């Protein structure tokens, strides 16, 4: 592996991590924006993943992306058990799917992106796995009334299910948009 490839993939991973920060800050608008950003953000994730997978045609494209997010999250004190397990499991699923479909194929990238697209939900999962702790943190860190609005979002399980289901077609759209815009990277895959 060339040094230039490693550096470019690490830069892509940092950009991917910045997208997590952008997704989480949209929660300042309303708690639902944070809770469901994981459904929309794959439109952006697709570009970073296609670039990374085209440059890194072997095991590790998804693992590097989620690994950098995990390391930065833990250093920043944002890591929790749900996030750690979620990011690792989703990256491993993506890697297994990509391996079974071919590291150098567009089909492998498309199919493996579906589990990877759920990665922001691994980051925000603490709302559902540690609701009391998340609400307490909201009371301490956010404006008055935020925790009440947040609780309403957390307890709206039907909407969470809908948003999780919608993540799949949004992920498929995100990777297809990336292919249309990033023709060189898409062409480097069979």
For the regions a language model picked out, list residue spans one by one.
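Helix-boundary and loop/linker segments of multi-pass membrane transporters
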Residues: 1, 39-40, 148-153
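Short, charged juxtamembrane terminal tails flanking transmembrane helices
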Residues: 1-3, 180-190
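Hydrophobic transmembrane alpha-helices
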Residues: 2-63
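Short helix-perturbing small/polar motifs within transmembrane alpha-helices
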Residues: 5-7, 11-14, 18, 85-125, ...
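Membrane-water interface at transmembrane helix exits
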Residues: 19, 23-27, 53, 57, ...
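Short alpha-helical transmembrane interface motifs in multi-pass membrane proteins
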Residues: 30-34, 78-79, 158-159
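Alpha-helical membrane segments and adjacent membrane-interface helices in multi-pass membrane proteins
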Residues: 37-96
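Membrane-embedded alpha-helical hairpins and interfacial helices in multi-pass inner-membrane proteins
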Residues: 109-184
């Amino acid at each position: 592996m060339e040094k230039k490839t490693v550096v470019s993939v690490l830069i892509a991973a940092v950009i991917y991590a910045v997208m997590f920060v952008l997704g989480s800050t949209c929660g300042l608008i309303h708690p639902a924006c944070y809770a469901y950003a994981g459904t929309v953000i794959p439109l952006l994730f697709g570009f970073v993943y296609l670039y990374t997978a085209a440059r890194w045609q072997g095991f590790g494209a998804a693992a590097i992306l989620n690994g950098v997010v995990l390391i930065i999250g833990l250093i920043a004190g944002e890591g929790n058990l749900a996030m750690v397990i979620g990011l690792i499991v989703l990256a491993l699923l993506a890697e297994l799917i990509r391996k079974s479909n071919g590291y150098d194929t567009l089909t492998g990238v498309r199919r493996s992106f579906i589990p990877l697209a759920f990665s922001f939900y691994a980051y925000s999962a603490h709302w559902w796995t540690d609701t009391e702790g998340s609400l307490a943190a909201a009371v301490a860190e956010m404006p008055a009334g935020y925790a009440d609005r947040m609780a309403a979002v957390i307890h709206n399980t039907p909407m969470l299910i809908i948003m999780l289901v919608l993540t799949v077609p949004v992920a498929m759209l995100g990777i297809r948009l990336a292919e249309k815009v990033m023709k060189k990277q898409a062409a480097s895959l069979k």
